[in-house]
Amino acid sequence: MIRTGIFGGSFNPIHNGHISLARQLREKTGLDEVWLMVSPQNPLKKSSDLLDDNLRMEMARLAVEGREGIIASDYEMHLPKPSYTWNTLQSLSKDYPEREFVLLMGGDNWALFDKWYHYDDILKNYCIVVYPRRDSIRSFGETLSAQIVEAELLDISSTEIRERIKAGKGIRRMVPKAVADFIKEKGLYAKEA
């Protein structure tokens, strides 16, 4: 079986912190690949400032180009909405029977995990790797399916990047060069819609 980590997110935009985390989780957990699953929407978040799916997907592709074992995936964009992790994992398992899918999530999502659609089925059927995020540490409890992995988190957020762009400030150290160039070329995030 090919062990494949699923790292879902809006990636609005993708940044160096996402790439660093994917690399660390792959190395620390022995995953063969990490798929950055660009999500069309998060059922628990409002998506009013969410950039077009294709633009976010293109930035993800640019960000992972040449990075071994890290793949940008638009798989979830082709599934019925809203986008629920349980549905995505079930569909992936059916379409890729040679792969063992492992769900990667931050401590902030783990803290709300019992609110997720079919969370109990996810726990029963899939391994989960949780990385603590700042201000999100809670008692994780002991489950057979969750593995806590310490990772060095870069102090970067997509929200901060969007705000810096709107303010006319640079982002080159926050995102891969190809992503910064793409954002600039397309004029993304520069003005309020």
Task: Please report, for each region that a protein language model flagged, where it lies by residue.
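Nucleotidyltransferase catalytic core that binds NTPs
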Residues: 1-193
